[in-house]
């Protein structure tokens, strides 16, 4: 097996230590930045939903503030954002390179995208259900958690899936400018040294990673839709 691998991707075998460390760095960036993105993106998405005109907690100032900041950071290409945030990144984590240096720009790049995804998912919740909950005495937090977030679970899962796949792309771009990870490995040891097998393996690894995330997202989304749950109950009867 080892001889066969060495014959089809000799350079990957030679740099196997670097390859596995780059995979680990990519996973670290993805998980840490993804966690922050999930938290802050959900908060901002909910804020945009409830503070808009006609929302359950209408607040024009807060809505305009969050909406404007989201639009500003969404409009900046990620590579430019990486450079722009170098001073802030150094102030927060002490460095602008490596995995630690990539977390801040990754969060700033992914949160606005996920915020819009959450806002769109919550917009699909029927206003009638919100009004019904309010008429039964539910408070604002109750409506947010028991109506908006509960009813939008399938769409929110799709939003998380799309954002996770997008975040993988951002981690590879971050690697191209010194953050490490698979993107950095593909450029430094693949393209720069003309080792095509390294580039090919990096592409395959990323494709597998994306396919797993997409498959999990699709499965969870189907399982949490009312139609899927209804069909499951009928079949079990």
What are these model-derived regions, one by one?
Residues 19, 23, 27, 65, ...:
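Hydrophobic alpha-helical elements at and bordering transmembrane segments
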Residues 170-200, 205, 225, 230-233:
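Glycine-rich helix-loop "coupling/hinge" segments at transmembrane-helix boundaries
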Residues 47-53, 135, 199-237:
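C-terminal transmembrane helix and the adjacent membrane-cytosol boundary/short C-terminal tail
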Residues 1-22:
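Short, strongly hydrophobic alpha-helical membrane anchors
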Residues 140-171:
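Transmembrane alpha-helices
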Residues 47-56, 89, 93, 126, ...:
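Membrane-interfacial segments
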Residues 122-152, 192:
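Short helix-to-coil transition segments within interhelical loops
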Residues 20-123, 158-165, 205-213:
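Membrane-water interface segments at the C-terminal ends of transmembrane alpha-helices
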């Amino acid at each position: 097996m080892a001889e066969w691998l060495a014959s089809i991707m000799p350079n990957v075998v030679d740099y196997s230590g670097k390859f596995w460390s780059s995979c680990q760095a990519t996973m670290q960036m993805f998980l840490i930045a993804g966690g922050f993105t999930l938290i802050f993106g959900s908060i901002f998405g909910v804020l945009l939903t409830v503070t808009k005109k006609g929302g359950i907690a209408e607040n024009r100032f807060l809505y305009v503030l969050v909406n404007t900041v989201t639009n500003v950071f969404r409009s900046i290409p990620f590579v430019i954002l990486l450079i722009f945030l170098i001073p802030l990144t150094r102030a927060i984590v002490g460095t602008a390179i490596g995995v630690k240096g990539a977390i801040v720009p990754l969060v700033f790049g992914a949160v606005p995208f996920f915020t819009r995804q959450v806002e769109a998912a919550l917009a699909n919740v029927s206003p009638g259900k919100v009004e019904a909950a309010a008429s039964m005495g539910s408070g604002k937090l109750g409506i947010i958690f028991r109506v908006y977030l509960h009813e939008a679970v399938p769409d929110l899962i799709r939003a998380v899936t799309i954002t996770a796949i997008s975040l993988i792309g951002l981690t590879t771009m971050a690697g191209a400018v010194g953050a490490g990870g698979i993107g950095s490995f593909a450029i430094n040891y693949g393209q720069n040294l003309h080792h095509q097998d390294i580039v090919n393996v990096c592409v395959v690894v990323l494709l597998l990673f994306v396919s797993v995330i997409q498959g999990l997202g699709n499965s969870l989304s189907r399982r949490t839709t009312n139609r899927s749950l209804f069909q499951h109950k009928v079949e079990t009867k």
